[in-house]
Amino acid sequence: MNLLSIQPLNRIAIQFGPLTVYWYGIIIGIGILLGLILATREGKKLQVPSNTFTDLVLYALPISILSARIYYVLFEWAYYKNHLNEIFAIWNGGIAIHGGLIGAIVTTIVFTKKRNISFWKLADIAAPSLILGQAIGRWGNFMNQEAHGGPVSRTFLESLRLPDIIINQMYINGSYYHPTFLYESIWNIIGFVTLLILRKGSLKRGEIFLSYLIWYSIGRFFVEGLRTDSLMLTSSLRMAQVMSISLIIISLLLMIYRRRKGLATTRYNELNNNALE
């Protein structure tokens, strides 16, 4: 293998004069669109008005992107304070999922209160869409050659039976790296299937969404330990791992609390439109 012949994939998908469209944005857009279609179809089965998720996305998407970028920039302020012109260059990557999740949850809480709809009902319906979108979105990191792990040998990557297109894209500045984007994407796809199975069971309202938070956080905690570009809370604490542990604990406590207080009595697929549950 002639290492000098390995060239990264072109991050630019389309270019019309000054207009540049990056694969990163296209891939994120595909994830959002598929998630919206999935949530809308499931919502119809549970008597949620057809325009509800479209309206929610129109509010939540820009706020989530903004909060995800702010979250990232704050933890990388040592760099961005000297590169202010790059703060809004999200096509180069650098949006934090946990920041986006915070923005999405806050927006959905406000949205459901104004529409007099159960937050937990919408969150449960959206949970598979969220994790599917995250699984797809990680391939944007692949195109940007970011969110990778530490150095490994080509032999190691070949032992994973990965196609050359992935192995070669993991060749960055003279070294091969762990394709952590792929590990997390696979974990999220398994989580997507798991959530589809769980929602056919006896879980109460809100518990599909909380299960999503737990599942995603478990995978993210371990994958984050392999990454080399983690946002750091301190010199030894990775912010994503702290957030993951926090979300697992909070989600478990919420499940227990809601059941004990009688706040979770409706099963996921019951046609109960009580906005308080």
Curated annotation (Swiss-Prot):
Subcellular location, record wording: Cell membrane
A GO BP annotation: lipoprotein biosynthetic process
CC annotations in GO: plasma membrane
Top-tier EC class: transferase
Stored Pfam families: LGT (PF01790)
Enzyme Commission numbers on file: 2.5.1.145
InterPro entries: Lgt
Positions of a 1,2-diacyl-sn-glycero-3-phospho-(1'-sn-glycerol) binding: R138
NCBIfam families hit by this protein: lgt
Stated family: Belongs to the Lgt family.
Role, per record: Catalyzes the transfer of the diacylglyceryl group from phosphatidylglycerol to the sulfhydryl group of the N-terminal cysteine of a prolipoprotein, the first step in the formation of mature lipoproteins.
Full protein name: Phosphatidylglycerol--prolipoprotein diacylglyceryl transferase 2
Organism, as annotated: Bacillus cereus (strain ATCC 10987 / NRS 248)
